């Protein structure tokens, strides 16, 4: 390869300065915000949906790298970060809750994901569970409690698509294939907390390859009440989730 050690991220092992933990938001615009909460933030690279920064927590290096939306791009980010030395991944995102008792602004820590994606099948058969690492989960729960966040711990439905896979009918065709008709009600009955689009791939990849991963998300809408989040609520919820993931990273270093 050229000057970088990995094809898509444009990073070298030297860029990481020995970092073994990465915080992985989906949105590239969140990367700098997260890095800014730590010491000595420095931008490393930006290619397509992948923006990466390095910073320090208590003198130890941490990488922040966006994954983009969905499993395929997440798998690229995780694969290439692992190649240059990352062994622990903390995903931070926003989400829509599907349980009536979960409020907008609450925080969800995922223990495992319903594998509604396709990318995770490229790493392990469907019988293999998409489970979070216990130490990562514990750190996220403790970090959430430390800032007084109302926290729910449980299972997430992780879909390849935002619309049909999450049983949304407000689309061009208004059509949802039979596989997903009534699926949200089924997940609700099973106690699934929410939908998002990356955790099944992340957790399956890491659990099946000896890597550690955890997942935290801020609730920006409860789909039993409405579909469109409030912009100010989104901003506040994102801020809380970012603080939690940084504090969890500190506990894991």
Curated annotation (Swiss-Prot):
Principal cellular location given in the protein's record: cytoplasm
Broad class of enzyme this protein falls into: transferase
InterPro entries: Nucleoside_phosphorylase_CS (IPR018016), Nucleoside_phosphorylase_d (IPR000845), Nucleoside_phosphorylase_sf (IPR035994), Uridine_phosphorylase (IPR010058)
Gene Ontology molecular function terms on file: uridine phosphorylase activity
A Gene Ontology BP annotation from the UniProt entry: UMP salvage
Record-listed E.C. numbers: 2.4.2.3
Subcellular location: Cytoplasm
GO cellular component, as recorded: cytosol
Catalytic activity of the protein: uridine + phosphate = alpha-D-ribose 1-phosphate + uracil
Gene3D superfamilies, alphabetized: Nucleoside phosphorylase domain
Functional note: Catalyzes the reversible phosphorylytic cleavage of uridine to uracil and ribose-1-phosphate.
Family: Belongs to the PNP/UDP phosphorylase family.
Protein name per its UniProtKB record: Uridine phosphorylase
Organism: Klebsiella aerogenes (Enterobacter aerogenes)
Lineage: Bacteria, Pseudomonadati, Pseudomonadota, Gammaproteobacteria, Enterobacterales
């Amino acid at each position: 390869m050229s000057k970088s050690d990995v094809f898509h991220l444009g990073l070298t092992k030297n860029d990481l300065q020995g970092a073994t933990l990465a915080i992985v938001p989906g949105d590239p615009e969140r990367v700098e915000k997260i890095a800014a909460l730590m010491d000595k933030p420095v931008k490393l690279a930006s290619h397509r949906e992948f923006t990466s920064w390095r910073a320090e927590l208590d003198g130890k290096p941490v990488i922040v790298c966006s994954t983009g939306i969905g499993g395929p791009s997440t798998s690229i980010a995780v694969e290439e970060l692992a190649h240059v030395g990352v062994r622990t991944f903390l995903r931070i995102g926003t989400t829509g809750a599907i349980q009536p008792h979960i409020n907008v602004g609450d925080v969800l820590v995922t223990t495992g994901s319903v594998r509604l994606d396709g990318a995770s099948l490229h790493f392990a058969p469907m019988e293999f569970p998409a489970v979070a690492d216990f130490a990562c989960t514990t750190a996220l729960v403790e970090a959430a409690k430390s800032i007084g966040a109302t926290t729910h711990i449980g299972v997430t439905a992780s879909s390849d698509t935002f619309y049909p896979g999450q049983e949304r009918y407000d689309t061009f065709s208004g059509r949802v294939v039979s596989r997903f008709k009534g699926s949200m009600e089924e997940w609700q009955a099973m106690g699934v907390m929410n939908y998002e689009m990356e955790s099944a791939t992340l957790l399956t990849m890491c659990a099946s390859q000896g890597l550690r991963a955890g997942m935290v998300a801020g609730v920006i809408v409860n789909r039993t009440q409405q579909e469109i989040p409030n912009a100010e609520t989104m901003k506040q919820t994102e801020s809380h989730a970012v603080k939690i993931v940084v504090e969890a990273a500190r506990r894991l270093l």
